[in-house]
Amino acid sequence: MSLAPHGGTLVNRVDESYDVSGIQKEIELDLISFADLELIGIGAYSPIEGFFNEKDYVSVVENMRLSSGVVWSLPITLPVDAQKAAELSLGETVKLTYEGETYGVIQIEDLYVPDKQKEAVNVYKTDEQEHPGVKKLFSRGNTYVGGPITLIKKASKQFPEFTFEPSETRRQFAEKGWETIVGFQTRNPVHRAHEYIQKTALETVDGLFLNPLVGETKSDDIPADVRMESYQVLLDHYYPKDRVFLGVFLAAMRYAGPREAIFHALVRKNYGCTHFIVGRDHAGVGDYYGTYEAQELFDTFKPEELGITPLKFEHSFFCKKCGNMGTAKTCPHGREHHVILSGTKVRGMLRDGVLPPAEFSRKEVVEVLIKGMKKKEEVGVS
């Protein structure tokens, strides 16, 4: 059986029969809070039951713990602008809308102005506007609304056949007889380095939960539909069907490096994972974080506080002399023999019309990516 959810209980804040006809006020969500609303509602963010009040916000920003003491690394907030904040009052129940449709309600228990400078430095380790997470933070409203939510409608899904709630993945893992499940988070197509890490992990557990993020990402990331097709073709040709489960993760990417790695692990724990792969520069961007800083952050918590086991991997590469994949732990040869693989490199090659070599990526995956990049250019998406 899967481990207990984070905090002990899988949160369920869904009530699709909730009557909002008497509620006049509303808050229009952006893409981040729209995704967060559903993820809170279905229990992916257990034990969180709503957008953070000031007490939880300050505690997480400063100590990576909720005010209850439970480990949580990223603030889950609902920002509004000053004009909207002036309309709201404590104790009110307000509709949460996206593109004019109501998806939930929030019972307002807190309205507060955050110290965004401190949030940026603590969460992202920088206040530079060039950092996509910091840029997004400062572009959002300057008042945060806190309180428990009720999810009354789920968004229509881009990938319905690969969209699962934590209660569903837990049931599926149990039906497969998996007792140990390793989660893998990615926003890139799976290249050979990822494949090597996943299969190495799979040697030690019952199942692999490949859980690509399909929420908001940077504009130069490969589109989600292209990535999903690349995952499917890879799994069909190179993975044992009865040992892998593919499902999407709806959250937006924060690019918060080490803190986001902890967040990714805790969420996968709620989906039923017992282990989580933490590679090099997990959830990083540019040169803001050390190569293995995310792995080191896991070591600052007691294992029972996290309740999910990190599987830490060094950067893997293809060694021409060995003739296969390896890491510094398994390969004795110098860097001149290594083909260093990365999602950034693969993206750059594809953009330049260069075919990545077989050591980089499987042929079937490359074909899907090239087709997808061409389509992206044709429709003029930047």
UniProtKB/Swiss-Prot annotation:
Disulfide bonds: none annotated. Its EC number is 2.7.7.4. It comes from Bacillus subtilis (strain 168). This is Sulfate adenylyltransferase. It is an enzyme of class 2 (transferase). Induction: Up-regulated by sulfur starvation and repressed by cysteine. Also induced by O-acetyl-L-serine (OAS), a direct precursor of cysteine, maybe via inactivation of a putative transcriptional repressor of the cysH operon whose activity is controlled by the intracellular levels of OAS. CDD domains: ATPS. Keywords: ATP-binding, Nucleotide-binding, Nucleotidyltransferase, Transferase.
